[in-house]
Each structure stands twice: as structure tokens, then as C-alpha cells.
Amino acid sequence: MEVTAPKLVGRHLRVAFMNTDATGSSPKFERMTNFTAMTNGKNPKEYSRQYVDESTERSDVVGYAPATEYSFDMYAGNPVHERIAAIHDGEKVADDAHVEVVTVDFYKKNTKGDKCFATKRTYAVIPDSDGDGTDALVYSGSLKAVSDIEEGYVTETDITSKTVTYTKGDYMGGVASTDFKVEKTQERIGE
């Protein structure tokens, strides 16, 4: 049996796409280009305690506060940049500062090679600064989660894709895990 050696995954194989549709009719997930930083932090919430009959403290993760720190060079005519800049410059609040982002792992393809694993989440754009430096107009801030993460896939498997179409479900071709639980529950009820 042939053993395949592990391969290092390049950062460029995890690509983010933002919904730039302003009409609300049909999502248009466009590639988030020209970002100089896009670092995801999970920010786990811990519950730590020490019981009187034990010598060691215990810790559990009880929640998360995911945030993605970003920085980009502003390009006029880039719909993603214009959407984020409008939130910064207009000091938008509440739902007006929310964006949907699909993150695609182009290195995670199904066995047929026609789908890539993706996640979707709604974030609040939290502006930090703009105008830093003299070479380009730079915007920076963070995207903080306002929804649960949803797993799905995209059928665009080319790393150079400028847009993607996201579908909720299992990229390996099976039933989505939440749908599976519902089916199993219904199966038991019907027995």
C-alpha cells in the first residue's frame, strides 16, 4: 500500500468571497482581493474552575467570539473594497454594517473534484482606521461574527475564480449534518 506524504497547505488556498449584492435579490459572492492581512482569531470563551477535591484547575471552552482582522489597499471599482469603505466612511451601524462572507478551502475537494469545502457566516464590519501610510489608501479593522458558521460547498474549483456560488450541504456529496439529524429523528418517530 502506497503512503502519501503530507503536503503543506499554502495560505493562498483559503480564499474569502463577500456578498456584494446591494438589492437583496440574489447573493453575489466576489473574491476579496488586495488584502494585505486577513487573520482569523477564534477568541474562545473559557469556563475555568478548581474543585476542592482536586489539585488541578479544569477549563472548558463554552463559546467563541470569532473575529477576522483585515487590512487592504483601496482600489476604486472593487465592489468588496467599496462596500467596506462605505461602512467605514459612512460610520454605518447595526444591520447596515453587516456583510456575508464565504470562505473557500480550495485544497479540500470532494472525491470527484467538482466541489470545494466552504463556510458562510455573517459578520459586523468593525472599522479601525483608514488613510494610514502615504503609498496607498489603506483601510483596516475587523470582521466580528454575528451568526453561527454554516458549512457547505462551492462548485467553482479553480483557484482563480472571481466569484463563487455557495450551497449549504456536505461537499463530499452526502446529506448535510443538520439534515441528517432531522431525518434520523423522523425515522425514530415513525417506528
Per-segment meaning from a language model:
Residues L13, P27, P44, P66, ...:
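Polar low-complexity intrinsically disordered regions enriched in Ser/Thr and small residues
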Residues A5, F106-Y107, D179:
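Generic N-terminal leader/processing signal
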Residues V154-E191:
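Intrinsically disordered, low-complexity terminal/linker regions enriched in Pro/Ser/Gly
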Residues L8, A22, T39, H88, ...:
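Intrinsically disordered, low-complexity segments enriched in small/polar residues
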